[in-house]
Curated annotation (Swiss-Prot):
CDD domains reported in the protein's UniProt record: HATPase_MutL-MLH-PMS-like, MutL_Trans
Protein name in UniProt: DNA mismatch repair protein MutL
Family membership noted in the UniProt record: Belongs to the DNA mismatch repair MutL/HexB family.
Organism from which the protein derives: Thermosipho melanesiensis (strain DSM 12029 / CIP 104789 / BI429)
Keyword DNA damage: yes
Gene that this sequence comes from: mutL
GO biological process: mismatch repair
Amino acid sequence: MGKIKKLDKNVVSRIAAGEAVAGPFSVVKELVENALDASATKIEIEILNGGKSYIKVKDNGEGMSRDDLLLSIEEHTTSKIEDFEDIYNLYSFGFRGEALSSISKVSKLVITSNDGKESNRLEVIGGKIKDIKEYPTSEKGTIVEVYDLFFNVPARRKFLKSDNVEKRYVVEYVEKFLLGNPDVEIVLKSDGEVVYNAVKGNLEDRFRLIFPEVREFTEVSGKYVKGIISSPSYYRNNRTGQIFFVQKRFVIDKMLYYIFETGYGEALLKHPYGVLFIEVPPRFVDVNVHPQKLEVKFSNPNVIYSDITRTVREGIKKFVSKKIFVKKEQNTVNENKLNYAYGPKSKPFQTNIEKNMLFNVEKKQLEVKRDIVVLKKRYVLFESNDGIYIMDFHAAHERILYDNIIKQLDEKVERLDLMIPIEIKIGKSFLQIAEGRKEDFKRFGFNIKIDKEKIIVLSIPSFIKPSDVVEVLMEILDEYRILGENPKSMKHIIADKACKKAVKTGYDILESEAKQLVEEVLKRGLTTCPHGRPLFLKITYKELDSFFERT
């Protein structure tokens, strides 16, 4: 008998449903998009335990008849298309006819719907209909309730995140939905508490709601694109503040991120905020290139990209004309001993990198044989017993400061109580992250309170300047949003961002300071900066002899 067997249809359907339904947030996404396709103007969402135990989406849309209700949970049943070519003339969100069918197979599903003529209630468990009956309701529309997601697929349920993280995923999706549909009233509740209660408005209202930290922005409009962009002086350390919609559908497209930032030109500092809507005739875009419809393909992308760049460039003229300056640090170094209590502003930390990529500088104390020479206010040259070394002064100073801060964070952190608390107004998804990480913040010297719409900072690590607190906290929250749960990352972000007194390239460096730094680096056996770049260029005497053809 052969080893290959045909899977049972029930097994196949549960596997397929598990692929289509990634987690609570994707259930919410599918149900909300169904509500929009039903012309809903008000949508209410409620979740319990991050959506793992209960999800409810209620809308005031067109509703469904008894026959449509029964068809809605069957595979590939839809009201949006009849043949394949209809995909290229779509204005709706759904079209594959798989959302409710997939959800019903991995949950206990209850749908109550009123189409204005009749009202019915359907109960489905694990894809099998348990009951359908008349169920009088006074309001036209549909209520979908999802209980015990993945109850019959334990392997999938096991891989769901914590309640707090799953809730955040739902909140982040709802924030995108709020931005993409300002003309729809939406309420989001989690474990009985109201997260969002957004009335109908315009894009500016929603932008302020989701990105309260951005105080300077403008509306832009081109041939195919319109939306809101921030001043270059408001930015994040990643692209989580950049949201794109194509035909009102949220998409993730690396090229769109790149083109958007290209429009900022020389005004670009890091990653500015932007919410852009791209509208083209349906036949010019393919929305069927990604399982979750998060990617699209344009038939003539260069036309779209040019319009985005041109539109953004016109928009930022309003800000550039205001002469946005980046504050420059003093171009001097304290003539006293180098301050090793502060650290660098640099890229995210890379762990466990101790190998010099250019030369194998052994981790041992070297003997500096002669005077130290400073080259071009940038490098330090010295001779040792086995050759000539050239050290990057800034990178070396940065490494020492970084290591000192990490050591403090591993031990007891000295706190500075703020006489005037610092208030940081941020979006709900960031508040959600902060709420779940209060103990981590406390461990590393921050005492914070979470309000309904802001973080209140009461104390900070003593080595962080109060003027840097907002930037440090926002970067920590950004990293958690992207990388997930990793307390170690908080430690390295704090060390990386907390201190900005590493001597920069081009600053005047006294020979006494250079000597002090070289001795400290050699004493510690350091070979790389915090990000893995080499500190030294080593040229052995043997290599010199070979170069000059001396034998």
